[in-house]
Design a protein with these regions (language model features):
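ABC ATPase nucleotide-binding domain helical subdomain, centered on the C-loop/LSGGQ "ABC signature"
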Residues: 1-36, 83, 91
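Catalytic "switch" loops of ABC-type ATPases
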Residues: 2, 99-100
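ABC-fold ATPase nucleotide-binding domain signature/coupling loops
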Residues: 20-49, 53-55, 61-62, 66-69, ...
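C-terminal portion of ABC ATPase nucleotide-binding domains
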Residues: 25, 83, 100, 105-146
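Conserved D-loop-proximal element of ABC-family nucleotide-binding domains
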Residues: 43, 74-79, 121
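Helical segment within the ABC ATPase nucleotide-binding domain
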Residues: 78-90, 102
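Conserved H-loop
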Residues: 91-99
């Protein structure tokens, strides 16, 4: 990656991206080859590996820009990854595009887009006062009940 990182930083990024359990099951751990002819990873595992690399690359940056970084990750891991992001990047600006509305409560400020235009903005509570967002939230909540 061209970025010098310590073993501790790698371990932290692995935990933040929720790859630690997978890596602990691999015979060679972090030394496992995941290139062609290496270990086969699922889409979510590949995405979490990319996130871990991104966390390491962003360690000295003031901004963390994410574009649906967890779109292939299950909802429980996704929520934990975002908790880890907000906990470990407290002093950074985190900008993230998400489609999972359940994550919105975690953000300080939200821009809601429709057809490439901002149709609402504010905190989660601000958005709940917007009729369009309220309908969207209600439908999303109903569809995603466990």
């Amino acid at each position: 990656m061209g970025v010098h990182v310590s073993e501790d930083e790698i371990e932290k990024a692995v935990k933040m991206s929720r790859l630690d359990k997978l890596i602990s099951r691999l015979e060679k751990g972090l030394k496992t080859n995941v290139m062609e002819r290496g270990v086969s990873l699922s889409g979510g595992e590949k995405q979490r590996l990319a996130l871990a690399r991104g966390f390491l690359a962003a360690k000295d940056s003031q901004f963390l820009l994410l574009d649906e970084p967890t779109s292939s990750v299950d909802i429980e891991n996704e929520a934990e990854i975002y908790r880890n992001i907000f906990e470990n990047f407290k002093d950074k600006v985190v900008i993230s595009a998400v489609h999972g509305l359940h994550l919105l409560k975690e953000f300080d400020y939200i821009y809601l887009f429709k057809n490439s235009r901002i149709v609402a903005e504010g905190t989660f509570n601000d958005l709940l006062s917007d009729e369009n967002f309220r309908v969207l939230w209600k439908n999303y909540s109903r569809e995603n009940k466990k």
